[in-house]
Amino acid sequence: VKQRKQIKGVNKPLSILEIAYDNIPVNKAKVNYMDIARYITEYVKDTGYTYVLIKGSDSIFEKTGYCYGASGYYAPSSQYGTATDFKHMIKELHNNGIGVIIDFNVAYFGIDIRSIVNYDGGDCYGYLKPRIIEKPQMNITTFAYEKGEVRSFLISAIAMWLDEYNIDGIKITDTATMLYLDYGKNPGEWTPNMYGGNENL
């Protein structure tokens, strides 16, 4: 963390390795965050990457094709260890000169009971009109960004990953879903905005 103030990233080469936990060739039954750190360190040193982009770092409970529904916006996946173990992984990578970026989905969340859907018994984070939010084929729903509690929830989550887990950057995924009401939907599955368009205002 202290080195961040001294490093002028714009004056240095940038090469990012994108990797998902599922693709790491280690024993899946016993893999933990330190195993992942060792593998990434060895691979990056051999190939010359400067950063690693880790996909699916937050807790996820379902994957459908290329997308996933997040359930723990403030917690790393417990499949590979505890939050403390995750911090040790980040520290190990930093000690070896490797920056860490994580995939972070602020476009939608899953509609599984383990997620934040109907968190307060109502639509705290989503919309009241199902056709605006639901993507049946993906089992997900989008955030209602006009709500102050939604903006606070997402901004606070990102700030926590940066401050508490000491990651170096965030990659915002699936921005098209955030911008367009009809993205990934068929006719009749979405509701136009107040002007009759498909933009998510």
Outline where the language-model segments fall.
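Substrate-binding/active-site clefts of carbohydrate-active enzymes
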Residues: 3-14, 18-199
